[in-house]
Amino acid sequence: MSDRVVFEAAEDGVGTVTLNRPDKLNAMDQGVFDGLHEATDRAREAIEAGTVRAILVRAEGRAFSSGLDISLFGQQASGDKPADDWIAYLQQAFTGLEDLRVPVVAAIRGVAFGAGCQLALAAHMRLAAPDAELALLEAKWALVPDLGGLTRLPRVVGLGRAADMSMTARRVDAETALAWGLVDRVLPAEDFEATSRAFVAELAAGPTVAIGAVPRSSPAAEDASVH
């Protein structure tokens, strides 16, 4: 597995997917996307085996993710995948997590910008530290949030606020995100890691297949594809 993403399964049924590139604010290069694919495959196997009953997506360091690493575009240009296939591969790194049949919870500390925000949106729930800040910055570079953000964000915050974030690259702080429904809980900074993990462990102790089916059973979730 890529060392940029770490998957761990604990005895209490919590599987943890950790972005592990703190020196780069967990910017997403090709290795991160490869690691997300590998981590999701391992999580799926553990779920099927009954050893993982809920997933926590977190990050090492002071940021959840600053977004795409600019090197990713050079890596694509020098690779042998057609652009459409490459974009589909990146999208599937997030969709694979979203499609897991147990609850998937993102724990956001610091910035979740661009692709980082889009990864958080792929989770079924989002927990935030008080210093969390979420944004889709793609408009600043004449890009679109094409890793599922344009589909998932309106489901979460509504069309108007989604347009605001997507068109203006507005940075949304934790309290505003909570008011908008962009995050579901803001947890204390001093024990954010422990509290967020305890929340996921509580989910893991419950009827996780039923809980995990809730996001996929929503009529809004069936109205559009991220592709």
Predicted regions located by residue number:
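Terminal peptide-recognition signature
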Residues: V17, R21, G35-L36, V57, ...
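Conserved CoA-thioester-binding segment of acyl-CoA-metabolizing enzymes
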Residues: M1-E60, K81, T95
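Crotonase-fold acyl-CoA enzyme core
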Residues: T95-I211
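A secondary-structure boundary/capping signal
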Residues: R21, R58-E60, S66-D69, A107-R109, ...
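Generic secondary-structure signature for well-ordered alpha-helical cores
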Residues: A201-V209, R216-V226
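Glycine- (often His-adjacent) and acidic-residue-rich active-site loop
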Residues: R4, A59-T95, A112, A142, ...
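Charged catalytic carboxylate motif
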Residues: G31-G35, Y89, G96, T195, ...
